[in-house]
Amino acid sequence: MSEDQRVISQPIELHKLSIVDKHSQGQQQQPHQKQHEVQPESKSPRVTTPLKPKRLAIPISSPQRSTTNQSPVSDHASPISTDQDLIYKLAAKHREINELSFKLEVAQKELKQLELQFKDTLPRNGQQKLGNQNPSEYLSTFTKRIQQTFVDVNNSPNMLKGKKSINDFFSKPNNNVNSNINNTLPNRKPNPPPNRSQRMQNIAPSRSSESTPTSGPPLLPPRNTMKNANTTATAGENTPFLQRILNKFNQMNMEEDEFDDLLEKRKSKKDHYYIKENLGYEYDEVRSEDEDDEEFEPMGDIPVHLFKR
């Protein structure tokens, strides 16, 4: 043997490359493999299929209660159970109340619907009554009902309170005027009008009068004010209720008009004074279009308004 020749102790098992349908080939080789399994292992260790590794997975299981802590032993076991019973009872009562309130709301809605249906049927019954009764009798009964409702409304406590408050509101200014008059005018006779000689003495001052101050009674108001106050008081008592309301509104409107007139007068006074914006030079004056005396003539097809500024 030459030196270049390689010495092989064991033959190397090499497989030829072949492109074949391995699926069909594998199915054909399965019975042959079963037969060879009975025989002892072949010489080549590569023929044996490798073993699949076992996968260690966590088993799926549902949680369960522990029996050890299910019934703990303690001294406070009895009050806890009683508290739980009370809580359950309270919850049951609350639920019952809620259910009853819901039923009450439903019943109220049904009642309103029934009332509306009953009102819809009323005109038909009224027409039947009109056919059976005389129209004059029906009108008389209807007017009696209306009058009775008016009387009931006017005699209601809320209406009486409202009328009383409104009467007090309108009677306050009259009472104030009368109280002022009674305070300024005590129960005494009015002084007679002075004569001509007394007037002259009052006009011509003297030294004696200057040296000794006179403490005379206060001046009396004219008789016209008393008459006007008395007449307004009697007129306010005699006028009806609605007329007094209208008079009050008219008085308020008059006061608003007077206030507006005062504002307009003040504005008119302010308008007389103003700050001059221009300095008074000739170029500050604005020329109007009427001052332009020059007339433009048309130039062919061009209109005249294009030449104007």
UniProtKB/Swiss-Prot annotation:
Residues 13-24, 34-44 have a biased composition (Basic and acidic residues). Keywords: Phosphoprotein. It comes from the Eukaryota. Residues 174-188, 205-214, 222-239 have a biased composition (Low complexity). Residues 287-298 have a biased composition (Acidic residues). Residues 1-80, 164-240, 286-309 are annotated as: Disordered. Residues 61-80 have a biased composition (Polar residues). The modification Phosphoserine is found at residues 44, 71, 74, 78, 165, 288. May be involved in actin cytoskeleton organization and biogenesis. Present with 1140 molecules/cell in log phase SD medium. This is Assembly-complementing factor 4.
